[in-house]
């Protein structure tokens, strides 16, 4: 007798057999096709005890059916046809189509039809492990003794033992290392999975998620079988879980039977290290979703109707193929069966492309991608940009040389059939998941966060916990902290305005080596849907979206870029000043309207890009020139700069006292004295939970006092510049103050924006303007520098110089042409202030705009 390990491959031997169930009278047992040649002349019983097949008329014989499906209750040992559990997940001995009047006939289809993620396992051979020939009278045995003898062909999985072990695991397992945050609402001293079954009864979602680490600590052998033979073992788990559930809750009504979903398999592989030994095994990989397809209908059961006599029949899909009936069983007409689509059964299917995470990539390598297929309720569970741990079965499918020829290539195509998604990342903030919002925080954690929010110095403590290794820059850290919290989302569509931007945009600019990039990297590693990109290595389509041909459907599809992938997150853009003009132009719509309009290759759509932009830029001369404005230093268009709520300068002061304090701070990162070790720092996990809770549950609204304070602040800002003929504020500055005030109220866990929030927003906004919008010639804050690209004094000086030049030309009399160089020297000699060539050119352009003169080459001609 061959052992299970030496049996042929289960892939090759999953076809059905037409054998009859064993009888207790000693008749010859018909062997499977592989054994038929050896036993056709023999009168003794064959070595292998076959499985009864489904569609034959053997339903009247309860012996074969009781073997797999009879309930443990003693009253059901004499099972009749109506008592057979025909909806068992393993479909051993079940009919190939639905049978009317079966138990739970209201459930559409068996779990084998409802679990396309496990592939087709309708007909599975079983092997008798006993090497001795049993006597004829010994064949009449109990269900338990027969179950102990049988394993699934090609494996060492004993169905009865496997089911018994899993039931024992569900009923007894208590996790000694369980954390309360991960098991909200569960008693950690009671069996976890029995409480999960109770949740299923209350909520009605028939999915039981099983941690493979729990299974491995409870039963190593059962865990090994699950990893090696998931296609055979998971249906057994389904069967065991359903038996426990319906025995405990017999009156419960579910949409379909409970499906067990294992996750966190120890066989976690890097995506690039998957190899042929992992095929058909349970694996867990991690990565970032970069593309999801549309929902694809996949046929599970075909409905055929005879065109002659209207006889109907159903055929299940086996390994992606339909066995079309060639002869009608009712009228014996050949080739008369037609497929009726609207009577067939379909399941949802979706293709997901998963890309390797940057932290898993070896140095100098490009990221690998793999194809996932999600089925039924796993469709639309993840979106592009999500970082997920995926548990599934690794598959290899042949590729045909020609679709019309059955020859296949020797190289197979691989994919993963998804069984479980887990959107978790310990290093990042909790993602806002609509399904798990209520389960994110325990009552104790919420109480601790609210106690922390009641402290008067919580704003400063949170800011100091943000990037503690970076010295000083308190106002910049406070601005980034408010960006992480964000404002309150509002909808003004009834007024015709549309959506009001709630995200805060921040620009950091200054000398090289002032830790701008470190701040960006810190924020990128903190937020759940963050993207990090560099200005020089980014293109317009890489930031927005581009059209590509889908390799599966050969149709044009839209591939999203960094700004769309960071929707509801933060997009960090380094080297912002080195972007080319076409790349920067796509940011205008995103930074104000929070949408992205696409019209390419016949695809016209508008994508959501509700992302905050945190950008860093270096000055053109490699060092900040205090005699130039911000726009002149970083060479960015004023239309883009005006969309940033806060623009901070990070300059190197070149002061000995500052240098000494900075050096002391850097050395302290490597060596801490006892006094420094005693200093209290806010835990990083607390900071993440604090921000996540505020973003999810705190939505402050403006109060009456805060509204009046905002109005007064805006009027005061306008009043400052009106006396000097310059504009010091625009409506965008007022909206920025509103967003910053709401974010500061979120820091305090306040549902109402108060005057204290407006005062802090005013102070932070004023500090940023002091640095970025100060006119270097007058030392006065002039918002026109950011909105129009030129300060009011520069504009006034330009107009005055143009008038002086005009008077100089008029004093020369009616001369039709003047030499450029001579006119420039005459102007310099007449003017008291120093006149540069650029200023002279600007004056000429101003007069040219008035149609007073024109410049051709080195000659100035009057009009």
Swiss-Prot record:
User: Where does it mainly reside?
Assistant: nucleus
The short motif Arginine finger is annotated over 642-645
Name the SUPFAM superfamilies for this protein: Nucleic acid-binding proteins (SSF50249), P-loop containing nucleoside triphosphate hydrolases (SSF52540)
Q: Residues that bind ATP 1, according to the entry?
A: 497, 643, 732, 735
Chain residues that bind ATP 2: 471, 516-517, 618
Molecular function (GO) terms for this protein are:
ATP binding; ATP hydrolysis activity; chromatin binding; DNA binding; DNA helicase activity; zinc ion binding
> Where do the ZnF regions (C4-type) fall?
306-331
CDD domains from the UniProt entry:
MCM4 (cd17755)
Segments carrying the region annotation (Disordered) are 1-121
Q: What catalytic reaction does the record list?
A: ATP + H2O = ADP + phosphate + H(+)
Its cellular-component GO annotations read: chromatin; CMG complex; MCM complex
Query: Bias regions of kind Polar residues — which residues?
Result: 54-64, 78-99
MCM domain residues: 458-667
Its subcellular locations are: Nucleus; Chromosome
Which keywords label this protein?
ATP-binding, Cell cycle, Chromosome, DNA replication, DNA-binding, Helicase, Hydrolase, Metal-binding, Nucleotide-binding, Nucleus, Phosphoprotein, Zinc, Zinc-finger
In its record, the post-translational modification comment is: Hyperphosphorylated during mitosis in a mechanism requiring cdc2-cyclin B and other kinases. Undergoes dephosphorylation after exiting mitosis, existing in a partially phosphorylated state in the cytosolic interphase mcm complex which associates with the pre-replication complexes (pre-Rcs). Complete dephosphorylation inactivates the mcm complex, preventing its binding to chromatin. Becomes actively phosphorylated during S phase once the mcm complex is assembled on the chromatin. This chromatin-associated phosphorylation occurs during the activation of the pre-Rcs and is independent of cdks.
Q: Which Gene3D superfamilies match?
A: 2.20.28.10, mini-chromosome maintenance (MCM) complex, chain A, domain 1, Nucleic acid-binding proteins, P-loop containing nucleotide triphosphate hydrolases
Q: What is its EC number?
A: 3.6.4.12
Partners and quaternary state? Component of the mcm2-7 complex (RLF-M). The complex forms a toroidal hexameric ring with the proposed subunit order mcm2-mcm6-mcm4-mcm7-mcm3-mcm5. The heterodimer of mmcm3/mcm5 interacts with mcm4, mmcm6, mcm7 and weakly with mcm2. Component of the CMG helicase complex, composed of the mcm2-7 complex, the GINS complex and cdc45.
Entry function = Acts as a component of the MCM2-7 complex (MCM complex) which is the replicative helicase essential for 'once per cell cycle' DNA replication initiation and elongation in eukaryotic cells. Core component of CDC45-MCM-GINS (CMG) helicase, the molecular machine that unwinds template DNA during replication, and around which the replisome is built.
* Additional detail: Early fractionation of eukaryotic MCM proteins yielded a variety of dimeric, trimeric and tetrameric complexes with unclear biological significance. Specifically a MCM467 subcomplex is shown to have in vitro helicase activity which is inhibited by the MCM2 subunit. The MCM2-7 hexamer is the proposed physiological active complex.
State the family it belongs to: Belongs to the MCM family.
Q: What is this protein called?
A: DNA replication licensing factor mcm4
């Amino acid at each position: 007798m061959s052992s299970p390990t030496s049996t042929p491959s289960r892939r090759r031997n999953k076809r059905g057999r037409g054998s009859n169930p064993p009888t207790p009278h000693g008749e010859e047992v018909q062997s499977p096709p592989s054994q038929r040649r050896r036993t056709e002349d023999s009168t003794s019983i064959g070595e292998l005890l076959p499985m009864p097949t489904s569609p034959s008329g053997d339903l009247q014989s309860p012996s074969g059916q009781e073997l797999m499906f009879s309930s443990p209750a003693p009253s059901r040992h004499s099972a009749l046809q109506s008592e057979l559990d025909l909806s068992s997940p393993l479909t051993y001995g079940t009919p190939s189509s639905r049978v009317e009047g079966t138990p739970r006939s209201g459930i559409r289809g068996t779990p084998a039809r409802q679990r396309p993620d496990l592939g087709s396992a309708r007909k599975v051979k079983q092997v008798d492990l006993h090497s001795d020939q049993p006597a004829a009278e010994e064949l009449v045995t109990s269900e338990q003794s027969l179950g102990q003898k049988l394993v699934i062909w090609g494996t060492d999985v004993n169905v009865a033992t496997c089911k018994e072990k899993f039931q024992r695991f569900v009923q007894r397992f208590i996790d000694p290392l369980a954390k309360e945050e991960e098991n909200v609402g569960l008693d950690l001293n009671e069996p976890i999975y029995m409480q999960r079954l109770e949740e299923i009864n209350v909520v009605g979602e028939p999915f039981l998620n099983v941690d493979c680490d729990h299974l491995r600590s409870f039963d190593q052998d059962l865990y090994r079988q699950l990893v090696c033979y998931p296609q055979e073992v998971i249906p057994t788990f389904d069967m065991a879980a359903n038996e426990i559930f319906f025995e405990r809750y017999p009156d419960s009504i579910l949409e379909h039977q409970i499906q067990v979903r294992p996750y966190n398999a120890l066989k976690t592989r890097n995506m690039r290290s998957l190899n042929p030994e992992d095929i058909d095994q349970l694996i867990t990989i991690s990565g970032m979703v970069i593309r999801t397809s549309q929902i694809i209908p996949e046929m599970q059961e075909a409905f055929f109707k005879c065109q002659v006599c209207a006889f109907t029949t159903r055929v299940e899909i086996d390994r992606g193929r339909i066995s079309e009936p060639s002869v009608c069983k009712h009228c014996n007409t050949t080739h008369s069966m037609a497929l009726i689509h609207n009577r067939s059964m379909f399941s949802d299917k979706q293709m997901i492309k998963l890309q390797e995470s940057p932290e898993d990539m070896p140095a100098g390598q490009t990221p690998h991608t793999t194809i996932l297929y999600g089925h039924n309720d796993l469709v639309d569970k993840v979106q592009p940009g999500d970082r997920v741990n995926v548990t599934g079965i690794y598959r290899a499918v042949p590729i045909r040389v020609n679709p019309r020829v059955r020859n296949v290539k020797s190289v197979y195509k691989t994919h993963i059939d998804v069984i479980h998604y887990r959107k978790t990342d310990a290093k990042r903030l909790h993602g806002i998941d609509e399904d798990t919002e209520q389960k994110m925080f325990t009552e104790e954690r919420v109480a601790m966060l609210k106690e922390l929010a009641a402290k008067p110095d919580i704003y400063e403590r949170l800011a100091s916990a943000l990037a503690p290794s970076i010295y000083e820059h308190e106002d910049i850290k406070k601005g980034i902290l408010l960006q992480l919290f964000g404002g309150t989302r509002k909808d003004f569509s009834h007024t015709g305005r549309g959506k009001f931007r709630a995200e805060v945009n921040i620009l950091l600019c200054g000398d090289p080596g002032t830790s701008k990039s470190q701040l960006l990297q810190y924020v990128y590693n903190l937020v759940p849907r963050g993207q990090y990109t560099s200005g020089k290595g980014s293109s317009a389509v890489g930031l927005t979206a581009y059209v590509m041909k889908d390799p599966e459907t050969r149709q044009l599809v839209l591939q999203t870029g960094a700004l769309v992938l960071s929707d509801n997150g933060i997009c960090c853009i380094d080297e912002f000043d080195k972007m080319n003009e076409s790349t920067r132009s796509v940011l205008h719509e995103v930074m104000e309207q929070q949408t992205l309009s696409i019209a390419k290759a016949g695809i016209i759509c508008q994508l959501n890009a509700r992302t905050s932009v945190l950008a860093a830029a270096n000055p053109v001369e490699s060092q900040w020139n205090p005699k130039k404005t911000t726009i002149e230093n970083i060479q960015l268009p004023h239309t883009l700069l005006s969309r940033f709520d806060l623009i901070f300068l990070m300059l190197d002061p070149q002061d000995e006292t500052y240098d000494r304090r900075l050096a002391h701070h850097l050395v302290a990162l490597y060596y801490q004295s006892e006094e420094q070790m005693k200093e209290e720092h806010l835990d990083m996990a607390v900071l993440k939970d604090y921000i996540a809770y505020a973003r999810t549950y705190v939505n402050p609204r403006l109060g009456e006092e805060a509204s009046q304070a905002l109005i007064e602040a805006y009027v005061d800002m306008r009043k400052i510049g009106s006396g000097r003929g310059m504009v010091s504020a625009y409506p965008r500055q007022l909206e920025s103050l509103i967003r910053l005030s709401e974010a500061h109220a979120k820091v305090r866990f306040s549902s109402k924006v108060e005057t204290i929030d407006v005062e802090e927003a005013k102070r932070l906004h004023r500090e940023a303007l002091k640095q970025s919008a100060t006119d270097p010639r007058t030392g006065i804050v002039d918002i026109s520098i950011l909105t129009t690209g030129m300060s009011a004094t520069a504009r006034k000086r330009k107009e005055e110089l143009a008038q002086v030049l005009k008077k100089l030309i008029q004093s020369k009399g009616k001369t039709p042409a003047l030499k450029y160089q001579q006119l420039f020297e005459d102007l310099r000699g007449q003017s008291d202030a120093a006149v540069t060539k650029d200023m002279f050119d600007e004056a000429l352009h101003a007069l040219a705009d008035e149609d007073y003169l024109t410049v051709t080459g080195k000659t100035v001609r009057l009009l």
